[in-house]
Amino acid sequence: MDYWDDWYASKAATPTVGEIMNRHLGLPPGLLAGVVPAEAIPELTTGLRLEPGDTLLDLACGRAGYGLTVAQGSGAGLVGIDVSAEALAQAREQAVRLGVTDARFHVGDLTASGLPDGSADAVLCTDAIQFPDDPSAAYREIRRVLKPGGRVALTSWEPVDRDDERLSVRLRRVDLAAGLAEAGFMRIEVRERPAWLERERAIWEEAVTIDPGDDPALISFHGEGVRSLEHLALIRRVLAVATAP
């Protein structure tokens, strides 16, 4: 996946972006993560109900900052799956830095992880469920790899109005409760987290003040800030947890 490999490589070459994001999100300096804030990590960990020795699948893990943190805090082993080999290379380096020894990373995607049926005790997927062309296939894949009674925790954005054409089609179709229910999950909870969105707002407000020059990562960060500020009022920030049958 050349686009994602290039994207992650540019972020690694320009640590300024991560420094700004982590400062607003309350994440530790140097943690390679996304836009889920620090206060979400205990909630994700609790929702996944991991025990020492369990297997946590971090699906579409990117550089696996969240999966590694949850695994480290719970004593679980981690399997990270992503389409980007570059992201996984950075994830492996991060696992070493964090001292997480039971962590494996493989190329795969949300709809075809390559893992055996029932091989995970829990699945974490942060801010990626919107990417597949067939979202229902992603929910089915999560159910397939989970053991009976296994837990899933998802974070994403949902539209305030699904008919609002100012939002991308990918975002307009995100419906965590419906997707999980269609795949057969039970005890589904979707929780709105507006405070997370305000942290994102602070990131993007700083991003648009930056002169990116010719730095690819800063150009991307600045542009994402402009687009995101236009749409923040149109979306809600959500976390979902559910149990496999």
Residue ranges and their predicted role:
Residues 122-134:
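A short SAM/SAH-binding and catalytic strip from SAM-dependent methyltransferases
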Residues 189-245:
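Conserved Class I S-adenosyl-L-methionine
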Residues 1-24:
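N-terminal, positively charged/glycine-rich alpha-helical extensions of SAM-dependent methyltransferases
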Residues 111-122:
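A short acidic, Gly/Pro-enriched loop at the edge of an enzyme's catalytic core
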Residues 136-148:
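A short glycine-rich, Lys/Arg-flanked "PGG" loop and its adjoining helix->strand segment in the class I
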Residues 57-59, 63-112:
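Class I SAM-dependent methyltransferase SAM/SAH-binding core
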Residues 34-52:
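Conserved alpha-helix/loop element of class I SAM-dependent methyltransferases that forms part
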Residues 150-156:
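Conserved beta-strand signature within the Rossmann-like core of class I S-adenosyl-L-methionine
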